[in-house]
Amino acid sequence: MDLIAPIDAVFLLAESREHPMHVGSLQLFEAPEDAGPDFARQTYEKLLSCKDIDATFRKRPATLFGAPRMAWTTEDDVELEYHVRRQAVPRPGGTDQLVELASSLHSALLDRHRPLWEIHLIEGLADGRFAVYSKMHHALIDGVSAQRLIQRTLTSEPAGEARVPWNLPRTPRTPATDSSAGLLGAARNLLSAAASGPTLLRTARAVLLEQQLTMPFEAPRTMFNVPIGGARRTVVRSWPLERIKQVKKATGATVNDVVLTMSAGALRSYLAERDALPDKPLIAMVPMSLRSPDDVATDGVKVGAVLCNLGTDVADPLDRLQVVGESMRKSKDVYSSLSSIQTMALSALMVSPIALSLLPGLVPLTNPAFNIVISNVPGPREPMYWNGARLDATYPMSIPFDGQAVNITLTTNGDNLDFGVVGCRRSVPELPRLLDHLENALSELESAAV
């Protein structure tokens, strides 16, 4: 029986009906041209035939006399028929019905009496495609690592071997055990590091003040920064990467700058149509890789985060892009000039509000540390396949928190950027409007720049 790391345990202790603590992913697949009508069923049966289950997918929280213990126990007899399920979307079988089903699945808690993961193969789409919704508890694996794990089940060849996440060959850096890969994974490591020396946080504060960077808890309060309920709504859409690149080329910005500005314009319009746009600009928490290209296989804390001024108080889209770009460049320049101890301290200070937001009742008592998390997760740039089916889209589905009622996560998939926006149904009404505003924001940037 292995003890659960203290920071991982927070995700179990803080979980409630209102606060599910799992990450998800929705993938869309196009069946092979020669596939018969039973292709989805046959794929499901192939999944169930993979009985060799990795240790990570056998772990569940231990109990003592019915009470939870902060330790993992290993399930010897994993019932795959429970964890791997077959679903069908209701008529008329469109994308809206698929995403609504995924939203419902994403709202439901994982059963702690079993290993903390589920995979749902979803059929019944009117266009003949099928989907896979996966979810895994954040105490087990962080969001970026889960995304990478799912990507490893894919192949670049249509005839490639069909692989499943619970039975993958080990690599020198296995995503299932790489807890430093994502933003919340960074919270695990960075908060532990910060706890080892109070001088780290003093160092971080000194760096922020000296460089005049945005400090945590300086963001305005918005309708997103409130306590949330348990019901989730997810909306998804894909945009051609070439459209973003055209704006990048015309303005000298980065792809991430354009994506952040696109998101900023959408948030500005969404809040403005509800008379809820604050005078001060919204602040986004943006995960940032601190790993150089030549140390991919190195362990340790290599993910930080920056606070980005989204310029939502600026009406002109190009001026807003300049604000976002300057904010991101300044933060990156500061990180590049820091020592390792300063980098660790600054990252800990930036990420720590994520863990603090898990504490019940804290949100109404403090100003928001930031208004929203916007994550850009690298994905495959070439066409990918699973059991011969072509991957059409991958929509990340992250975790809203108290004080963070909406989350925007996107990933690269071939020539597209796939956006997954997850929000609290109660706190963020008419979430699909945010997709319309994202399109309008990109169109405004194109009109002004290209």
What do these predicted regions represent?
Residues M1-I7, L26-F39, Y44-Q404, I408-V450:
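Soluble acyl-CoA-dependent acyltransferase catalytic core bearing the H(X)4D motif
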